[in-house]
C-alpha cells in the first residue's frame, strides 16, 4: 500500500544549496522542501517569494517535495 501524503500550500522564504528550499506553510509550520523531478526536468525556476504546493509525509512533517509552483497574480508568465 502506498504511503498517503498531505499536500499543503506555502511560501518559499529561503533558498538553500542543492535545490533545497525553506518553505513556510499556510499553517505557519516551517518545512524543508526539495524540487521534484518533473519541475527540475521542465526547467521551472523556483525562487524565494514564490507560492508553491508541497507534498509532505504524514510521518515526517519537517521535509517535503515541491510539486507545483503557483502563479503570482502580478507576473505576466
From Swiss-Prot:
The keyword Plastid applies. GO terms for cellular component: chloroplast; cytosol. Its main location: plastid. Keywords: Chloroplast, Initiation factor, Plastid, Protein biosynthesis, RNA-binding, rRNA-binding. GO terms for molecular function: ribosome binding; rRNA binding; translation initiation factor activity. It is found in: Plastid, Chloroplast. InterPro entries: NA-bd_OB-fold, RNA-binding_domain_S1_IF1, TIF_IF1. The keyword Hydrolase does not apply. Residues 1-71 form the S1-like domain. HAMAP family: IF_1. One of the essential components for the initiation of protein synthesis. Stabilizes the binding of IF-2 and IF-3 on the 30S subunit to which N-formylmethionyl-tRNA(fMet) subsequently binds. Helps modulate mRNA selection, yielding the 30S pre-initiation complex (PIC). Upon addition of the 50S ribosomal subunit IF-1, IF-2 and IF-3 are released leaving the mature 70S translation initiation complex. Belongs to the IF-1 family. Component of the 30S ribosomal translation pre-initiation complex which assembles on the 30S ribosome in the order IF-2 and IF-3, IF-1 and N-formylmethionyl-tRNA(fMet); mRNA recruitment can occur at any time during PIC assembly. This is Translation initiation factor IF-1, chloroplastic. It comes from Cornus mas (Cornelian cherry dogwood).
Amino acid at each position: 500500500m502506498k504511503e498517503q501524503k498531505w499536500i499543503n500550500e506555502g511560501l518559499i522564504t529561503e533558498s538553500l544549496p542543492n535545490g533545497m528550499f525553506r518553505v513556510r506553510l499556510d499553517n505557519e509550520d516551517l518545512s524543508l522542501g526539495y524540487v521534484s523531478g518533473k519541475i527540475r526536468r521542465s526547467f521551472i525556476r523556483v525562487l524565494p517569494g514564490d507560492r508553491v504546493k508541497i507534498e509532505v509525509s504524514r510521518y515526517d512533517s519537517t521535509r517535503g517535495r515541491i510539486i507545483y509552483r503557483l502563479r503570482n497574480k502580478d507576473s505576466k508568465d
